[in-house]
């Protein structure tokens, strides 16, 4: 039986963030996605992974160089991508990917979802920072 909340888009974004964070330490996309999706579920190892989850993880991986370039452009003078925490970097990558490349999700929805996940996994200062960087990117696209 599938729990609607557990497979909500927000939950899948959160699991994509967890997978992207773990990939900073090595591994492959599918293994990271499978672990992030099933680690707290009573599901078999062979549970079908939601397409949305796989799309986010693979999309960030495929576009990572361009995403990192866009993030770097929007950082304040003196800041570099390497100076960011892995949590903030992973959230920015996921948010920017969904805003720029995943056309099914309205920009403002993607922005709000990443900010809510940031509030859960980071501190208030970081969630405001992520909001500022991604909001600036959204405003420049208009």
Curated annotation (Swiss-Prot):
One of its GO terms (biological process) is transcription antitermination. It comes from Streptococcus mutans serotype c (strain ATCC 700610 / UA159). Belongs to the NusB family. Keywords: RNA-binding, Transcription, Transcription antitermination, Transcription regulation. The gene is nusB. Signal peptide: none annotated. Pfam families: NusB. One of its GO terms (molecular function) is RNA binding. This is Transcription antitermination protein NusB. Involved in transcription antitermination. Required for transcription of ribosomal RNA (rRNA) genes. Binds specifically to the boxA antiterminator sequence of the ribosomal RNA (rrn) operons. HAMAP family: NusB (MF_00073). One of its GO terms (cellular component) is cytosol.
